């Protein structure tokens, strides 16, 4: 256990917490491991055992946020709402979370967007999670005969491709000035009608 009295996971969590604060206050370009280590109360060498470099620390910040988002989407998947409403809510939450992150935490969003453009492993895991959750929903919709004209796999693929500009981080940022939830909602509704939904 480090001399701070924190466990290894505690050091990691504290470093992430302090990094979030520094990004908010100064921008992610100004984050330095040596400064974070000093605030945590460990040597920068010790902090390297948790984060190989600055990029790894910034990735940990974004990964934590995406993990929270994945959990929100999972709660939607498991909710008692009708299946069409869950599919709709899934896409709206995915879009809304990224848009609000950019509006309220622009510097944190910049760090996330940078990782996203590089398709870091944790980004790929998030995308796989989103696809798996949606496939579960489309399979349920198929069983309920709301999707009858295509397979659940094809419906999942078409929904993800059609809604890409509402969920891709850089495109969300570029269209930040517009409230596009209505367009997204209408798009999902049109696709579901095309798949055989009432």
Task: State where each predicted segment sits.
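N-terminal intrinsically disordered/low-complexity leader segments
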Residues: 1-10, 80
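C-terminal peripheral helix-coil segments that are non-catalytic and often amphipathic
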Residues: 2, 89, 132-143, 161-162, ...
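Short amphipathic alpha-helix in the helical subdomain of ABC transporter nucleotide-binding domains
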Residues: 8-11, 152-159, 180, 184
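Helix-turn-helix
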Residues: 14, 18, 22-56, 60
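Hydrophobic alpha-helical connector segments
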Residues: 60, 74-100, 156-159
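Short, basic, alpha-helical segments at the C-terminal edge of helix-turn-helix-like DNA-binding modules
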Residues: 63-70
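Amphipathic alpha-helical packing segments from all-alpha helical-bundle domains
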Residues: 70, 117-143, 153-157, 182
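Amphipathic alpha-helical segments used for helix-helix packing
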Residues: 98-118, 168-171
């Amino acid at each position: 256990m480090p001399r701070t009295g924190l466990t290894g996971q505690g050091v990691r969590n504290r470093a992430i917490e302090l990094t979030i604060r520094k990004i908010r206050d100064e921008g992610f370009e100004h984050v330095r491991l040596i400064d974070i280590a000093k605030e945590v109360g460990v040597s920068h060498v010790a902090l390297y055992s948790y984060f190989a470099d600055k990029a790894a620390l910034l990735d940990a910040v974004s990964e934590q946020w995406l993990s929270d988002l994945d959990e929100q989407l999972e709660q939607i998947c498991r909710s008692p709402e009708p299946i069409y409403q869950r599919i709709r809510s899934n896409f709206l939450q995915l879009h809304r979370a990224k848009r609000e992150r950019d509006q309220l935490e622009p510097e944190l969003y910049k760090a996330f967007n940078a990782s996203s453009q590089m398709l870091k492993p944790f980004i790929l895991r998030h995308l796989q999670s989103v696809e798996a959750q949606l496939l579960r929903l489309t399979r349920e919709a198929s069983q309920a005969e709301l999707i009858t004209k295509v397979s659940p796999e094809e419906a999942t693929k078409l929904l993800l491709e059609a809604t890409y500009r509402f969920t891709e981080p850089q495109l969300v940022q570029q269209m930040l000035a517009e409230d596009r939830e209505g367009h997204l909602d209408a798009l999902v509704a049109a696709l579901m009608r095309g798949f055989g939904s009432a």
